[in-house]
Structure formats: structure tokens, C-alpha cells
């Protein structure tokens, strides 16, 4: 991008340690193979607050691993003021009490990969930043384990699984359309911000 040589890798999405390990392994392989000056984690996330608009850019001051509460501080980006905490978890968090507790801790958004990537970067002394855009809201019930299972590990839609899901739940097509639109908007917003960040 611009005058900066750029390498992009896809770590996919995750709901279990195996997927977090994949993000970790992909990052480690990249950093062990190529001299990298800076890693930017770009992707989508779920807002913890029902009032957060879809497409909102998330620039956290802190990333916390839900697995062991380890904390990572990203390098600030020139995209606006960083605020709040991004909580990385292998679990799909749907309990409103958990959401309230996380909000009280300053969590603004949830993802499934950033802490794993940050850990590798910090172990190797490579600066890193993160930007995410909100694709859905954790507290509105739009995503559950079955819905998350409609995506391939790389994040792309699994069309046969979606068709089977709609045969079982014919009234759910509006939910899927809303999620697809939210994911598309968030992905575009995150990509635009990433280009701006390195330009």
C-alpha cells in the first residue's frame, strides 16, 4: 500500500482454541519467515453495546485475552483516539450478565483472534496495531453457535450449510441477510481504515 510493501494473511475466525492457535501459528510463521516492521490486525467484531452502530470503527486502547486475562497494548493508529477494551474470546458470549460485566470493565467489542496475534508480536518484539469494525451486536441475539457455524474457518459463507439452516429455519432469512449486510459493511469499513492507516 503506497510506498510500504504489504503482506496480507487470513487467519480466519475462531470459536475454539484450535482457531486461536491457527491465528497464532499463522502470525508466528509470517514473523519467522519475513522481516516485518509492523503488524496491523484488521477485521470485524461484535459490539458489546446494543446502541453501537454497525460499521463503527473499533480502535481499542487495550486488548485482553478472555482465556487468561493477559493484556496487550496496541500501537496507536492515526485514525482517531483509541478507547475501550477489545476482549478476545474463544467462546460465543450470549449471556446478558456477562455482557454487563464486560461493559463495566470498559469492553467495547468482542473478537476471536486479536489477543493471540498480539501475543506472538510481543514475544518477537514486533509493534502491532488493531482496527476492527462492528459487524453485529453481541447482545442482540443475532449470532449464536449455529449461525457462527454457517461460516467456513476462513470466514467465508458456507453456502450448503446456510441452505440447510434455512430449510430448518425458513423464517431466519431476514436475520441472515442482516448479518451478511453488517459483515459486508464492517469489512469494507475496516479495509478502508487499514488503507488509510498505512498511506
Language-model segment annotations:
Residues 1-199:
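Glycine-rich phosphate- or other oxyanion-binding loops that anchor nucleotides, phosphorylated ligands
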